[in-house]
Each structure stands twice: as C-alpha cells, then as structure tokens.
C-alpha cells in the first residue's frame, strides 16, 4: 500500500499496483468532502491522493458514492490513469464545479464510464479534460446535460488527438458566458460540424477558442453561430494553418467586439477573405493585427 485516508465519509486506499479504491466508511453510502483547491494559490489544498497522482493507474469503487458540490481538481495530474471504470455509478447530481477534474490525464483513451453522469447542475466545466491528449472522440459525453454551464474555458484544450466533436452536437450551451481556449491546440480536428447547433447567444468571450487547430480546413460548422454579445475574439483562430477561407463567417455579428488582435494570425494558407468586409468592426480597438503574419495589414488599417 502506498497511501490511505478518509475524505468526507469515503475512505480511500492506493495500492502498489496503482489502483485507487474508494468505499463508504460505513460500507454502504458515502460522500466526498468538497475540493479545497484555491486556484492561482501556492497553498495547495487538494484531495490527499493528489499527492500521489502520478502513481494512480486505475480507479475502483464499491458501495454508493456521492460527489460533492465542488469536485474541482479531483484527479488533476493523474498522468498514468488509464481507466475510469470505478466512476460509472457515482451519484453526481449535486455537482456544481467540475473544473480541472481530469486535467492532465494524458493517457485516458475514452470516457465511456462517464456517459451516464448527471451533470444537470454543473456550472463550471473549465479545464475539465484539459490535456487529455489520448482522447480521440467525445461520443461518451453525448447525453450530458449542460443546461446550467456558465464557464467552459479550456474544457478540451490540448486534446491533440481529437478528430471530431460529434459527441457534443446536442449540448445545451444557452447559458455559457465564456468559451476561451475551449478547443485550443486540438490539432487533429478537421471540421467543427459537431458544434454547429451550439447556442452562443450569451457568450461574451471566445479568445483563443480554436487557436492551434492546425488541421481545420473550413469553418462551415460555425456559420450560424450567434456572436452578437461577444466582446473578445483575440487569437481566436491563431495558427489555424490549414484554413484557406473565412467566408463561412460572413454573417457573424461582430458589432460588440472590441479585441480582434491576431484573430487569424499565422493562418498561413488563408487566401480568401470574402465575408470579412461584411463585419461591423467599429468598436475594434486595433485592426492592424487581425491577419498578422498572413496578409497585408494595410487592407485593414
């Protein structure tokens, strides 16, 4: 045994094989204590097993397990974790904050054991699957209820093996306010058709949202997005080096956008700017760098 302890009314043990076992103290039902992580603080107050994150290879559980309202950073940095089978029957209907829960779980190949999670009360999903670089698709999340989510920042950023977003096509994003870095450096994505029905009418910020998606060849999946309340679009498509055209975005409402710095910067294949002339950029503070490193900026001065 490497370590053991108690979280709320759940006892846990981590054995020499890397198996993290959770079971209720009374053998029947238990609830985790809420996360104590203070973001941007040097005073780390995560779960006790976070100290051994690199040794955790699989998770198992027995009895009825209830997730706390705040489960942020619960398995942060479990870079050797390959199985989530112990989580499939967890009661998650009280969860509000799942931020960074599986952040930097490099070797997770699928999320099948999370497919039945009740996420109807979750508000914060930021960094939830950040740097899950072995994930190839998100089909397991297709039934997640995201109706109350407000923050999706960096949710799938650096998921470099993701090839499509079909699993997200029915997500309810009505209440999301921030989508910064959501798909940042998802370098294997070739299209965005899976999110074409997303309601983005309340989103305020989309900075770096698709930056580094170097395999994207078109933006047709975004043509019907409502961007009427977006203020920040800086670096949104930066280094989408396979994009040849932005014509699909011709009907975007950019009347409230104030920052577009390097929005299409380093889009080295971009040759067709048809559609950009339709945009209202009256409130944009600096227009000179929108197409930095890809076209003559004099056109937009």
Where are these regions (language model features)?
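Negatively charged
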Residues: 1-301
């Amino acid at each position: 045994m490497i370590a053991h302890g108690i979280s709320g009314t759940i006892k846990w043990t981590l054995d020499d094989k890397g198996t993290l076992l959770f079971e209720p103290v009374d053998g029947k039902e238990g609830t985790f204590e809420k996360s104590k992580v203070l973001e941007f603080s040097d005073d780390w107050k995560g779960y006790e097993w976070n100290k051994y994150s690199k040794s955790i290879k699989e998770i198992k559980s027995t009895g009825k397990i209830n997730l706390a309202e705040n489960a942020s950073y619960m398995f942060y940095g479990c870079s050797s974790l390959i199985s989530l089978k112990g989580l499939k029957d967890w009661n998650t209907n009280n969860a509000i904050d799942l931020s960074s829960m599986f952040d930097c779980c490099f070797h997770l190949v699928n999320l099948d054991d999370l497919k039945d999670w009740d996420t109807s009360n979750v508000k914060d999903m930021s960094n939830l699957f950040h740097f899950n670089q072995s994930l190839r698709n998100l089909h397991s999340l297709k039934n997640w209820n995201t109706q109350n989510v407000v923050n999706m920042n960096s949710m799938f950023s650096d998921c470099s093996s993701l090839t499509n977003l079909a699993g997200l096509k029915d997500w309810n994003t009505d209440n999301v306010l921030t989508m910064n870095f959501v798909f940042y450096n998802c370098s294997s994505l070739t299209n965005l058709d899976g999110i074409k029905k997303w309601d983005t009418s309340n989103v305020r910020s989309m900075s770096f949202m698709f930056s580094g998606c170097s395999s994207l060849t078109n933006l047709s999946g975004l043509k019907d997005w409502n961007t009427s309340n977006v203020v920040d679009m800086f670096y949104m498509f930066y280094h989408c080096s396979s994009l040849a055209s932005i014509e699909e975005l011709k009907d975007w409402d950019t009347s409230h956008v104030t920052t577009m710095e390097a929005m299409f910067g380093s889009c080295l294949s971009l040759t067709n700017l048809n559609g950009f002339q339709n945009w209202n950029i009256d409130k944009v503070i600096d227009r000179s760098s929108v197409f930095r490193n890809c076209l003559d900026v004099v056109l937009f001065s």
